[in-house]
């Protein structure tokens, strides 16, 4: 088939010069290009969507004097390599081999899975209309800019007489335009960004170097144009490195009622890139050619057609009536002085493979048909559609058959400027964002494969300065959900990621699971001679086992052994004793009156170098002249011989847990914790004493210095079972931003994060579904409680959660481990039974 080259299509680019976000065209017109940031609005946040549409309509209505505007959503290359290079600067030297392997695996897997990794960016193009264009500028245009680009090839083109400062009189106008568009928070682009946006249709789908492409245009405007061909109804772009194919698909019809259609968001369901180009023109409302005149003539035709349809009993009547209703609605809008626009939508999927492009086109057209959106293939119009959809090209002769008329408010029902990203821009891959409301029915891999919206995590970004759009400085994070939903998997994955960067990491493992599991994996990898970087990583972890039956551990959690601050030592000592005896009992009140001075006394002795412990205090109080005090002290001294309490009550002769290692997992054997909502038994109170000590141990760990520290505390729900526990938790949460400390609580309910007398928040929350706690979880996550949001959360499959990030964005997350060597470390249920493999 004969090719239609760009030279035969009768269209050319008219760009003359660029300055910041201003573009000079050869017909004297000047345009401003603004980058429009997107807002993260969950698909189940109806109120947030309505607000965004109102803001968007308010901004667009302010452009009526400009007569038209252009809106582009471009799929820009998401180059992850520079991001990982930035992240690698924070890798800890002792574990960097594993960190590098994980990042390389992510890059390789994404390259195999997706042709393009991209991020959608919105750009608004506005013509700057002014009556103050200088006559000198007009004259210079008339004299020398008839066709500048063709003249540039000649030597004397370099000396054409036009003002090099043409942009000066437009800068104030552009600044005023930014203020008019303040609802959209527009960004004035740099000249490099402006050139790159203008070049995008030429570069679509090609392998490029951005700086190289931009610098060519900066050197000479003649370098703006690039070779393209049109063949068999598609556009072919080429450079030295690659070839790309694209197809321009104009929208022929939208549904008659587009309320809540959210067309732009619907397009996010595709894992391949789709550029969207929109030209919008404000319609005049006066004159015979105005929209009112056209509408009146159409109404008369509808009336005659309806009469004819009635006479012939025609089935055409329904469609004619619907068209008449739309015409009447348009008249009402004009009467209400609403702004009317004609707009033209063009969708442009692209690929480096022609067969893949055709598959994508078919998939897109089938999808749009399901939503009653008709697309045109426009086989003979590809060249004109290509060139007319460049930014700043406001003549759309090739679009005449694709005109959509609506009010500005109706136009905004397409839901522009929605950001579907979650998490940080620099970090480790945590999973994929899931935009489905329905259930994946247990197939978490299908959920992962269906999304190319990557979610990254960085534990210390929240308290860093100059991070745009973040809404919290709090480093703390919570993982919540019932057993079996995936919270342990996520907790271990986050622990591994945190331990790969320059920080000190502590994991409190009350269930004593991790050491056994990690060592088992290490032995397997050693035997099979695989994943050496994982073996080295496991070797770098200091596994501490606190066994109350081992005399070497006696006093490991004694406040006098590890609480450096006198106040912390006294508070913990009182908290532990209060758990064992009733502090509200009158007799015990006498004991606490003597206990506090005794603690202070032995803290003073410790400061002088004496070896003291909790038993030293109890033994001292057995000699108290008050019989009730002595009796209680003898009781506590006797209890200290209990194997579990021996971890916290000692003579101070043994050392505390050593945390010299950068990565530590501390497990406790023999703990008997109460069930959630149940009063603790006598034996369970002893376990709680140990857990309180561990809580203060985290406080000591996090506040020791100003370097980055992270603590993971599993089974943290127990803190809420007693008043003493709640106070310990409150103290733990207060060690945060100023100390560069992050606390991660793994628990069963969002209520475990809340307290009436404590307003310390959590920067991130990962909530796995708990069927009987749907409403309270959604409320805590700041998600409106509706039937859709309930279904959205309830339908999370195993391995999915609803995540709240430091930017205040909430979305459904499919958790993903990107590296096979880590999977056995994360699995909480392992079996060698063949019949348990459901894949058979």
Provide a role label for each language-model segment:
Residues 39, 46-64, 76, 268, ...:
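P-loop NTPase motor domains
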Residues 1-416, 430-431:
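Extended, folded cores of ATP/NTP-driven motor/assembly subunits in large transport
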Residues 111-113, 557-612, 754-840:
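P-loop NTPase motor core of the ASCE superfamily
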Residues 144-155, 317, 393-412, 460-473, ...:
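Charged, glycine/proline-rich intrinsically disordered loops and linkers
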Residues 306-307, 460-485, 489-495, 506-522, ...:
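Conserved P-loop NTPase motor cores
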Residues 71-91, 103, 110, 493-595:
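Switch/coupling segment of Walker-type NTPase motor domains
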Residues 71, 187-197, 276-283, 371-385, ...:
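A generic structural motif
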Residues 67, 120, 502-503, 541, ...:
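Short glycine-/polar-rich loops that comprise or flank the Walker A/P-loop
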